[in-house]
C-alpha cells in the first residue's frame, strides 16, 4: 500500500476499535466469452463486474487473499475477516480464505465462521443506487426487511460510499440504524464471532 496517508487513516481506525477486513484485491472480475445467462446476471446485472471471487480457483484466490493479508501486516494492520466483493464467494475461494487464516466471511444472507464452519443466518440491509429504479426498490425492500429483522439476533447494515450521495438513502440508513440499536449493542464481526465461540465452549 503506497498511499501513506490512507495507511495512517486505517491504522488510526483500527486503534480506535474499528475492524479492518480484506474486501477482495482488485474488486473486479473481467468478462469472459461463453458465460452462461446466470453468470452474466450475477456478475454484470447484480453487480458491475465486481464478482472478483465468484469463480476464482483455489490457488489464485489464496494468492490474492494472502497478498492482501501480508500487505496489511507490513502496515501493522491485522485483518481477521474476508468479505468478497458483492458477497460473491465461490466454494474454492472460501476454502482459500480459511487456509489464509481468515476467521470469518460474510454473504448477503449471513456470517460464516471459517475456522469451525458454523453459519449464522443474518440478512443484511444493503442498497443498490446505480439508477433511480434501484434506489426506489432498495428503499422499499429495506423498509420491509428492517421490520422483519426486528427480533433477529444479529442485524447488519452494509453501507457503501455511493450511498452517501443520495439523501433519501442516507436518511433511511440513519433512521433504520437508530431503530436497530435501540435494543442491540454495536459490535464487530471479529468480536461477535468470538462471542459465539465462547458460548459453544471453544
Question: Residues of each region from the PLM?
Answer:
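Active-site beta->alpha N-cap acidic-glycine motif
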Residues: 1-21, 74, 170
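Short, solvent-exposed beta-strand-terminating loops
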Residues: 18-38
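C-terminal domain-boundary segment and adjacent tail
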Residues: 104, 159-202
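A conserved mid-domain beta-alpha-beta active-site/ligand-binding segment of alpha/beta enzyme cores
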Residues: 118-168
